[in-house]
A protein has these predicted regions:
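Sec/SRP-type N-terminal targeting helices
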Residues: 42-46, 59-60, 126, 142-170, ...
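Short, basic, low-complexity termini and linkers enriched in Ser/Thr/Gly/Pro
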Residues: 6-21
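Acidic, low-complexity, intrinsically disordered peripheral segments
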Residues: 67, 74-93, 258, 441-466
């Protein structure tokens, strides 16, 4: 017997130690951890970095493009060529100061050189050896049909959409964390309600057993109380299991190991409906901003598509230097050259390809406009539904509070009636069970009100992540 008592004492001490070292987390702390850990949010932030880099790259298209080229190669190619020799006429200066050939006209009209110089054949060798070519070129677009400016504007829209996507993801993380946190709070408080109910039954059982010993009650009364005790034990076990699973789910969301020892605390009550913001429009919601930018992106795409079939004008300049090679023992290449030019490109649409592509882009823009209108109406409907659910949750909470007060008073009166013998045990047990049910309903109503409040804030675009 002493060994059993020692073992129970050791187990209780270990459980107390675990509870003492359990980390107590508030709702704000869980939201902060979830925002740091959430992979979807990290991906959204990386998407913002990507779109920012894209925007900067498109902005660079406004500036001149500068290219450097350097080529150095060695070749063993070599060869020799000969310039054939011949007779070169000799010119004389006449009285008018003009050069005339020194020739004799033959009878057949042909010419015979009176004097000439003999030009011998010339042989020259060449080698490529090492040749270096270097150049620098500058190209500045003057007009590209609006493609450069349109692409830049579209990249800025992409950055804005990425920023709003971060807001949207943050709000989704906050809502998800609220749901997980209040699921744990609900399970914890349901366990407390079940334990309170069990305490009432334990006290009642002692009284019934005492009355049985004095012959004032039957064994059947004891069995009735024991049945309720068993039901209470099962409710406690279910609540504890639900609480552990809810804590594991919360740890998963906030990035802690599933086996972490954590506890949750009761959060503040949700504000009254009269203090809630009533949005005039859905423009503050990130979903609306994303849709608006998506529609504008489709409009800009019409301009971008049209720019492919407009004239393109660019001006360019370059300088090149060449060095290397040998011809007749002397350097062949050793000079530089500069050039300046204008490029004009004018696409010609002979078969309607450009026209149809522009029409297709316009159709996509109209589709985006209709989708935006439809989703705007859906968001307004979502807000109205969230507002109704919040009002209903407040009404349910108020009714549950009243019902619990009535159940507590009914249980008190029933206890008095039972103790003086004016009410059977079954009726008293029924009032206790009713009190336990009203307490559980109140816990559920409080948690549902908090979740309805968060959903309403998200639907109105006023949900803060801080």
């Amino acid at each position: 017997m002493k060994k059993i008592l020692s073992l129970l004492l050791l187990v209780n001490c270990q459980l107390s130690t675990v509870n003492c070292f359990a980390q107590t987390l508030t709702l704000d702390e869980c939201i902060g951890k979830a925002l740091e850990y959430n992979k979807s949010l990290s991906s959204a932030k990386m998407k913002l970095d990507q779109t920012t880099f894209d925007m900067k790259s498109y902005k660079a298209n406004f500036y001149p493009q500068i290219n450097l080229l350097a080529l150095d190669f060695y070749s063993t190619a070599r060869g020799e060529f000969t310039i054939e020799g011949g007779h070169l006429p000799i010119y004389s200066l006449d009285a008018s100061g003009k050069y005339v050939p020194n020739v004799t006209v033959n009878d057949d009209g042909s010419y015979t050189l009176n004097q000439y110089a003999d030009f011998p054949s010339q042989s020259m060798k060449w080698k490529l050896k090492n040749i270096f070519v270097g150049s620098v070129s500058v190209m500045e677009p003057l007009y590209a049909g609006g493609k450069i400016s349109t692409a830049y504007e579209m990249s800025k829209l992409g950055v804005n959409m990425a920023q709003e996507n971060i807001r949207l993801t943050e709000s989704e993380v906050v809502v998800k964390t609220h749901e997980a946190y209040y699921l744990a709070v609900k399970a914890k408080e349901l366990g407390e309600v079940a334990r309170s109910y069990k305490t009432l039954l334990d006290e009642l059982k002692k009284n019934v057993e005492g009355a049985f010993r004095h012959g004032m009650s039957t064994r059947n009364d004891i069995m009735k109380v024991q049945v309720k005790q068993n039901e209470a034990e099962l409710s406690i076990q279910k609540a504890d299991n639900g609480y552990q699973l809810a804590l594991m789910n919360l740890c998963h969301i906030i990035g802690l190991p599933l086996t972490s020892e954590v506890e949750v605390v009761k959060a503040e009550d949700a504000p009254a409906a009269s203090s809630l913001p009533v949005p005039v429009e859905m423009g503050v919601r990130p979903e609306h901003v994303i849709l608006d930018n998506k529609t504008e992106l489709a409009r800009q795409n019409v301009k971008l598509t049209r720019s492919d079939y407009l004239p393109n004008v660019a001006v360019g300049a370059s300088y090149a230097y060449s060095h290397g090679g040998e011809l007749a023992g002397k350097k062949l290449l050793n000079n530089g050259s500069a050039s300046l030019g204008v490029v004009v490109k004018m696409p010609i649409d002979l078969f309607g390809g450009s026209t149809n592509k522009v029409r297709s882009a316009k159709a996509a823009y109209q589709i985006a406009q209709m989708e935006q209108q439809d989703l705007d109406e859906q968001m307004q409907l979502e807000w109205a539904q969230s507002k109704n659910l919040y009002d209903e949750a407040q009404t349910e909470l108020r009714l549950c509070q009243t019902a619990l007060e009535q159940a507590a008073e009914n249980m008190r009166l029933s206890k008095q009636q039972y103790e003086v013998g004016f009410e059977p045990l079954a009726d008293y047990l029924e009032t206790q069970a009713h009190w336990q049910q009203c307490s559980a309903n109140l816990v559920n109503a409080r948690c549902q009100l908090q979740l309805a409040y968060v959903q309403l804030m998200k639907a109105s675009g006023t949900l803060s992540v801080h």
